[in-house]
UniProtKB/Swiss-Prot annotation:
Signal peptide: none annotated. It comes from the Bacteria. Substrate binds at H125, R155, D156, R187, R193, R263, A264, D265, R266, K337. GO terms for biological process: glucose catabolic process; glycolytic process. NCBIfam families: pgm_bpd_ind, PRK05434.1-5. Mn(2+) 2 binds at D14, S64, D445, H446. This is 2,3-bisphosphoglycerate-independent phosphoglycerate mutase. It comes from Serratia proteamaculans (strain 568). It is an enzyme of class 5 (isomerase). Belongs to the BPG-independent phosphoglycerate mutase family. The active site is at S64. Monomer. The gene is gpmI. PANTHER family: 2,3-BISPHOSPHOGLYCERATE-INDEPENDENT PHOSPHOGLYCERATE MUTASE. It catalyses: (2R)-2-phosphoglycerate = (2R)-3-phosphoglycerate.
Amino acid sequence: MSSNKKPMVLVILDGYGHREEQQDNAILNAKTPVMDRLWQQQPHQLIAASGLDVGLPDGQMGNSEVGHVNLGAGRIVYQDLTRLDKEIKEGDFFANPTLTAAVDKAVQAGKAVHIMGLLSPGGVHSHEDHILAMIELASQRGAKAVYLHAFLDGRDTPPRSAEASLQRFSDAFAKLGTGRIASLIGRYYAMDRDNRWDRVQLAYDLLTQAKGDYVTDNAVGALQAAYERGENDEFVKPTVLQAAGEAKAELHDGDALIFMNFRADRARQIVRSFVNADFDGFPRAKIINFGDFVMLTEYAADIKAPCAYPPASLSNTFGEWLMKHDKTQLRISETEKYAHVTFFFNGGVEEPFTGEDRVLINSPKVATYDLQPEMSAAELTDKLLAAIASGKYDAIICNYPNGDMVGHTGVYDAAVKAVETLDNCIAQVVEAVKAVDGQLLITADHGNAEQMRDPATGQAHTAHTSLPVPLIYIGKPASAVNGGKLSDIAPTMLALMGMEIPQEMTGKPLFIVE
């Protein structure tokens, strides 16, 4: 293998959006001499990373999964959110064979239909409209015992915003005359993705045993009590909802459980705890023999459970195209974004392509990343620099999670520190790429840290934004072609590498080498 390759390096600064106003802008107010200089001196532009430009509904903020799928595919990929909205609107959702079979089986056996998911209008991991449609589907097909286990958001939505959703669903159940909200828990516990199994166990025990820190008879009241304890939506402790004289709504053998999240990365752990016979993340006090356990979308190829909406396969993504041309590639990130530069960037393909190496750096084990805004950036940079210098790779894809993960905490000073950490890392990466006569693209998958307070509510802004993101090129003399979006990045890299662009990629190169 050649040992003097000049790599095409893509650095994705997660959650690093562009916003002109300084107020509450951790990116603009941070000391970033390196990025400032690159923006002034190198070919650059702003590119779209949200809404219709990435296959989401118009105006919908971008997110990491969607961003990386578009980055790697080189075409606009219509997302699960858009697809499900369309299915519900046109009525096809209510005839989905996997969903209807699970409900019918439970109804015929006199069993309950349990629905779990992130109860949120955020549209990143789920949408509450889909959960409502599922409740309606179950009711239409004769289910009497319909139980909603609500995971609360406060991360892709304002930190204390769940009341409207809980009231909406309390009213919906009352109107249907069947079913109820059975439990509440913050997504911090139910949707962990970093192998913190003690968190997931709390959600598992809540659903399987109706075991919670609190028991009350009213969802909105339970939320208010959580706020009084100092818990925002994301961190609401396990709460059982049970009125006087009502039976507990825990899972029983033969029940159906339908998981209404459509995004995979934060769904996998809790699903494995329910369905994997050899699960060993924590001791399960009670193992459920489900009538059916249904995933809304495919969370991982190795999870053996029915899937209502299997993925549409993407051919000739950036990674696959490199493999077909005998090129070598590296994917590298921390735990928090490792799935994004591998599984999502490869269009939902779990296994590495031939010639694709992967490096995983452990994210620090802290409760929230404002406590360590540097995260593992120093170690990640060291490994990246070594890979660039090695001469082994034609292309390197790297994600720095700091802007997004610290942005999600809503802690402004920590976000500033995260951005300043990134600037120092970028300085080293630029020098390393220049030293081997390589090429470098710096961009982001969506915004976050540029808006740390919500001007409308005055609360911390913990969600993503729908703002554009920067794109900077360092390498050969070149000029920018404006009007770009994330799906233009893969064709841009291929063009800069002197490679043909596959016909499946409808994106356009954004830099013309002079």
